[in-house]
Structures are given as C-alpha cells and as structure tokens.
Curated annotation (Swiss-Prot):
The modification N-acetylglycine is found at G2. The keyword 4Fe-4S does not apply. Its main location: mitochondrion. Heme c binds at C15, C18, H19, M81. It is found in: Mitochondrion intermembrane space. This is Cytochrome c, somatic.
C-alpha cells in the first residue's frame, strides 16, 4: 500500500485540475471521484461519459486503478481522459492510497 500524504501531493499536481474527491464535490472536466472504489466504470451520477467508459464494465479497485493509471487511453480506448498516465509504480500506489482514503471518508 502506498503513502497517503505523497499520494495527496500527486493528486494535487496531476489530477485536481480535472477531478474532485469530496462527497459534495462537483464534476469538472473529469468526474467527481467520491465513491470510486467498488463502482463500475462510467457510473458517476451526473457525468457524461464516452460509450467506451460506460461499456468497459470493470469495477474500480486497487488493481484496476493501478493498471488504468499507468496508461488510461490504453486501458480504456476511447476515454475522454487526456492524462498520459503515471509510469512509476510507487507513485501510482501512493495516489491509489490517497484516493482510497479521500473518496470514502
């Protein structure tokens, strides 16, 4: 499991421009991530997803996020997410640790 504090810094630097994590957070360019873990792709209420995201059909968890965050466009071809990905495994683990905590508390 990664480091939550390091993950928060990564989120602020690389994700917060397009995503929020708070329960009452608004959608931005990307969806609000509250309740992410255990939810299927393309299912955040009120966000307009591509058909690729809606039909991927996987459930978000540590393993699926770890793979997705390395190269989002390879994992879900046709996604609107224009982020290139995080290549360093430890950075992905830190970000996932932060997301797990921040999207459920």
């Amino acid at each position: 499991m990664g480091d939550v504090e390091k993950g928060k810094k990564i989120f602020v630097q690389k994700c917060a421009q397009c995503h929020t994590v708070e329960k009452t957070g608004k959608h931005k360019t990307g969806p609000n991530l509250w309740g992410l873990f255990g939810r299927k792709t393309g299912q955040a209420p009120g966000f307009s997803y591509t058909d690729a995201n809606k039909s991927k059909g996987i459930v978000w968890g540590e393993d699926t996020l770890f793979e997705y965050l390395e190269n989002p466009k390879k994992y879900i071809p046709g996604t609107k997410m224009i982020f290139a990905g995080i290549k360093k495994k430890n950075e992905r683990a830190d970000l996932i640790a932060y997301l797990k905590k921040s999207t459920s508390e």
